[in-house]
Amino acid sequence: VNVITYEFENIPYKILKKLNEIKPVLPKPEINKLIQNRYTEKDFLNKNNIRTTRYSLIKDEDDIKINDGLIPGLLKTCTLGYDGKGQFKIDKTENISSEIDFTKEYILEKFVKLKKEISVIITRFGHQRYEIYEPIENLHEDQILKHSKIPAQISEKIKNQATNWATIIAEELDYVGTLCVEYFIDNKDNLYANEIAPRVHNSGHLTINSHNVSQFENHIRAVCGLEKVETKKIYNARMLNLIGNDIEDYRVKNFKDNEFFFDYQKTEIREKRKMGHFTIIEK
């Protein structure tokens, strides 16, 4: 083993730090520690002049009432939680769920009037050396990514801003490998950084078929110190996540030459579990 990498951010920092004493871990363990906590992640973004929704650290019910200017908003656990887990909608200070466990720390984020969600995937190979994929447009259902498409239907201003912010993030983190920045666009065409994923990302799975170099190959090239290949889009593409029982129809389907089915071969089908994905390219 020459280098260690990972594709799941909820790995305890102590484990990554210990591994890093044996062989280099990329992305660096300190980056993952920063991003694992939604509050420190938001602070990092704001310190770098990257707009986020308004937010506050919440330790108890009184903190929610003090921050009533953030309501309506979304209460999220500061750590863990994935695909909408550990999240609570707060509409009124009098309507706080009894399911909230205040032995944990939370972040309360004010809702924006959402028009669209996009993501930008970037691979950093070292100081100011990048390969950047154009923004991908995403649609979530029940807080789980359902559809992605490239190109995103967005203004040139938003495209440039989203790409620029992703570059700043990768550079300020001294990141090596592929990362994704997820964004909100509001009804006034303002861009907000929602979160950073320090890994290859679900929305970027379509790059396997849409580009000459996928997000996965670029990640491996970066962490292994291999040659950087100029990344080009070959086809526009749309991707559908296959969640739960959706996978069963696709396992028996016949596909056209511009359709690609990926079965993750998970042993158990469960509700809200990502079982595979399906990509269509526009030839």
Region roles according to the model:
Residues 1-63, 80-81:
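Conserved N-proximal alpha/beta basic substrate-recognition cap immediately N-terminal to
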